[in-house]
UniProtKB/Swiss-Prot annotation:
Family to which the UniProt record says this protein belongs: Belongs to the amino acid-polyamine-organocation (APC) superfamily. YAT (TC 2.A.3.10) family.
Subcellular location: Golgi apparatus; Endoplasmic reticulum; Membrane
Protein name: Probable proline-specific permease put4
UniProt key word Ribosomal protein: no
Keyword Transport: yes
One MF term in the entry's GO annotations: L-proline transmembrane transporter activity
Highest rank taxon of the organism: Eukaryota
Protein species of origin: Schizosaccharomyces pombe (strain 972 / ATCC 24843)
GO BP of this protein: amino acid transmembrane transport; proline import across plasma membrane
UniProt entry keywords in alphabetical sequence: Amino-acid transport, Endoplasmic reticulum, Golgi apparatus, Membrane, Transmembrane, Transmembrane helix, Transport
Length: 552
């Protein structure tokens, strides 16, 4: 009976697909065209800047201050190195799968269902969606806190409403508008971080009004690895591991921004590899060098930093970058950096709303969510998905009646662990994809290849599993246990499990993943190759264009 039910479920899915499809000819090949399809309007330069700019938010500019104060500069730096490796591996896995099969409306959810299991895709898909909801809420909350650095004239709820309306509008019209907005937001963030790193070098060598050569002063006298919660070597390890977990928020669900945009990108087989292959250099420069700069210019025991964290201070007041600049007695820059932080929070909220709406849109296309979420307006935007994501992002209004810092930390914890679970699912899908491609003698035909596989994936899976299971370990250390912190740290795990089991019960498909020989690695490839022919590579006419085409 169970097998019959599972067969009926699969047949109903195929029947729905048939009623939603018409065929058009592209390059002489019949290609599926879904009604209400998104449109490929994002260009290479949009994808390149989304790859790095969309994820640079409050985690790096503000959230790093908490990790610095608790763990010390060396722990902060090493935590960013470790998380950069994790992100690089996840990006490579997604890049290979997406470049091989860049279907319209495809997402990580598509590949998890195709290569692993429909139930895992269901759980991962909804996990993606509510993680992005939390991220939109957290970035909007952060932006409202940043504005309060200048004025309290408008209530917090007012700023949250204005910012939610702004990102909703940017995500409701041409996707090109979203791409252009993120392009310029990202340029501002990149220029700011480059400037801050250069300024950090100047401060390091004493080129400030005080002429005080800092060097690695704040790494000495036992401050490099600070004791946290408990004393001695155990305390230093607790501090280090706490920094690793907290640093995850600065990166969380960043690789997926590129993959969610792939279905709306011109020439995805050319532009997605370009974005993913250069991601490692951006990680090294912006995140690793950025965290090193923070540890050089700001002491983990700085009174301003500690007071800002304990009081839930707003924006630049809690940014270790700004505190280091103020200590160097450089005027005005604190307001400039606060403006950059505000831009970053708005930009990240905008990007996360885009990804969240595409998550539920992709779920609907995979028949894992109501059909209404597949509806796209005449500009190719899934407006129902956007509206529902914005509606739930109104959780940010909790900030109007609770401590901003407390609510911000709740959202950080929930979204971070959801992101870790999503990455585990992606890497499992990649290993299945790899095995199926090898079995079908197609492994060497994939258009984009990444190094150190599958070993990097196995190591990253181990790290992610360890981080996920221990993310709330500090509540068990010393006398710091609180029910709120415990729930925030681990509530995502039972939610994910309930989603997975519920789908198994509904579909009556009790297999734990597809057998390798059952995995389809050919359907859709001809369409992808035909699509590639529609977008010939641009030929540079001069040295300036050659440089620009390399960058973007």
């Amino acid at each position: 009976m169970d097998e019959k039910k599972a067969l009926q479920y699969e047949e109903s899915k195929r029947a729905e697909e048939i009623t939603d499809i018409e065929l058009v000819s592209v390059g002489g090949i019949d290609v599926e065209k879904k009604y209400g399809e998104t449109k490929r309007a994002l260009k290479s330069r949009h994808v390149q800047l989304i790859a790095i700019g969309g994820c640079i938010g409050t985690g790096l500019f503000v959230g790093s201050g908490s990790a610095l104060s608790e763990s010390g500069p060396a722990s902060l730096f090493l935590s960013y190195v470790i998380m950069s490796f994790v992100i690089w591996t996840v990006m490579n896995a997604l890049g290979e799968m997406c470049t091989y099969l860049p279907l319209s409306g495809a997402s990580p959810i598509t590949y998890i269902e195709r290569y692993v299991d429909a139930s895992l895709a269901f759980a991962a898909g909804w996990n993606y969606w509510y993680a992005y909801v939390f991220l939109v809420a957290s970035e909007v909350t952060a932006a409202s806190i940043v504005i309060e650095y200048w004025t309290y004239a408008v209530p917090t709820a007012g700023w949250i409403a204005i910012l939610l309306f702004l990102v909703a509008v940017l995500n409701s019209f041409f996707v090109k508008w979203f791409g252009e907005t993120e392009f310029w937001f990202a340029i501002i963030k990149v220029i700011a971080i480059v400037g801050l790193i250069i300024l950090g070098v100047v401060i390091f060598f004493g080129g400030t009004p005080k002429h005080d050569r800092l060097g690695f002063r704040y790494w000495k006298h036992g401050l490099a690895f600070r004791e946290y919660i408990v004393k001695g070597a155990s305390g230093r390890f607790v501090g280090f591991w706490s920094a690793v977990i907290k640093s995850g928020f600065a990166f969380i669900l960043a690789p997926e921004l590129v993959i969610f945009s792939a279905g709306e990108t011109e020439a995805p087989r050319r532009n997605i590899p370009k974005a993913t292959s250069r991601f490692i250099y951006r990680l090294i420069f912006f995140y690793i060098f950025g965290s090193l700069t923070i540890g050089v210019i700001t002491s983990s025991k700085d009174p301003r930093l500690l007071n800002a964290i304990s009081s839930g201070a707003s924006g630049a007041a809690a940014s270790p970058f700004v505190i280091g600049i103020q200590n160097a007695e450089i005027p005005v820059l604190n307001h400039i950096i606060n403006a950059v932080i505000l831009t970053s929070a708005c930009s990240s909220g905008n990007s996360f709303l885009f990804a969240g709406s595409r998550s539920i849109y992709s779920l609907a296309k995979e028949h894992q969510a109501p059909k209404i979420f597949k509806y796209c307006n005449r500009w190719g935007v899934p407006v129902i998905s956007v509206a529902v994501t914005v509606l739930f992002a109104c959780l940010a209004f909790l900030n109007a009646s609770a401590s901003a810092a407390v609510v911000f930390n709740w959202f950080c914890n929930l979204s971070t662990i959801s992101g870790f679970l999503a990455w585990i699912c992606v890497l499992v899908a990649y290993l299945q994809f790899r095995k199926a491609m090898i079995l079908n003698n197609l492994w060497e035909t994939r258009p984009y290849k990444t190094p150190f596989q599958p070993y990097a994936t196995y190591l990253t899976l181990f790290l992610l599993a360890l981080i996920t299971l221990t993310n709330g370990f500090t509540v068990f250390v010393g006398h710091t246990f609180t029910a709120g912190n415990f729930i925030a740290a681990y509530i995502t795990l039972p939610i994910f499990l309930v989603l997975y089991v519920a789908h198994k019960l509904w579909s009556r498909n009790w297999s734990f993943g597809k057998r390798i020989e059952e995995i389809d690695v050919t359907t859709g490839v001809a369409e992808a190759e035909a699509l590639e022919q529609m977008y010939p590579a641009p030929v540079p006419r001069n040295i300036i264009e050659k440089i620009w085409f390399w960058i973007a």
